Structure formats: C-alpha cells, structure tokens
Regions:
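Cell wall/extracellular polymer interaction/catalysis modules
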Residues: 1-92, 99-104, 110-121
C-alpha cells in the first residue's frame, strides 16, 4: 500500500521547509521516493495528522489544485506555487513545475478511485 508523507523541518523564522515523499510499504519496511520540496508559513502550519487529498477546482486560483480535506478548523488548504512564506495564508507552497506534477499525479490517482492519504510529520 502506498501513501504520501510530508516531513517538515524545525521552523526557521517565518518559514517551514519540508519534503514530500511517496511511501511504499513492504511488511514493516518503508521505502521513500522524493516527490518535491515544500514551504509553509510557520504561523499557520498544518497540524501533524493524516489527511485525505482531493483535486478540485480552486475558486481563488481558477484551476485544478490539490486540497487537503478535513483540516481541523480550516478549509481550502491547497498545494499551490509560491516561493516565500508570505505567498501563503495557510497553504503548502511548491514550485510551479511541482504544482503541475502534483496536480496531475493526484488527479490520476483520484480517477483511478484510489484514496490519496497524506501524513504530515
């Protein structure tokens, strides 16, 4: 079974850097495949839990983007392009290329009827 894991570093000022991985499990062993680096606003970090991800049309950005489902006390938490913590009011930032890659990756999984799970660490 595969799922995704976002491993974050200790906040550095206003920024929290992280890395998104695809996790393959085989027995008790996990194999991590790096997908892309991430950036969050330290003041608005997503709680360390497991979330479902869906790809939907963003009313704000007017394009398909991945969105985290059931984030406690919040809504509309998306993965979108950005390079500085101030580019986010609580979303997860990735490069423009990685935004396209993630959207396509998760859209394909969604069409395949697979549940997309993402663990925040």
């Amino acid at each position: 079974m595969a799922y995704y894991k976002l491993i974050r570093e200790i906040p550095d000022g206003k920024a929290v850097h992280g890395n998104l991985y695809l996790v393959h499990t085989s027995g008790v062993r996990e194999q991590l495949t790096h997908i892309c680096p991430t950036l969050e606003n330290a003041d608005k970090m997503i709680p360390a839990l497991i979330y479902r991800v869906a790809v939907t049309q963003s009313p704000r950005f007017k394009r398909l983007l991945p969105v985290l489902c059931q984030v406690p006390g919040r809504s509309g938490i998306r993965f979108h392009r950005g390079t500085k913590p101030q580019h986010s009011s609580g979303c997860i930032l990735v490069s423009a290329e990685d935004e396209i890659k993630l959207t396509n990756l998760w859209l394909n999984e969604q069409h395949g009827k697979e549940e997309i799970r993402l663990e925040f660490c």
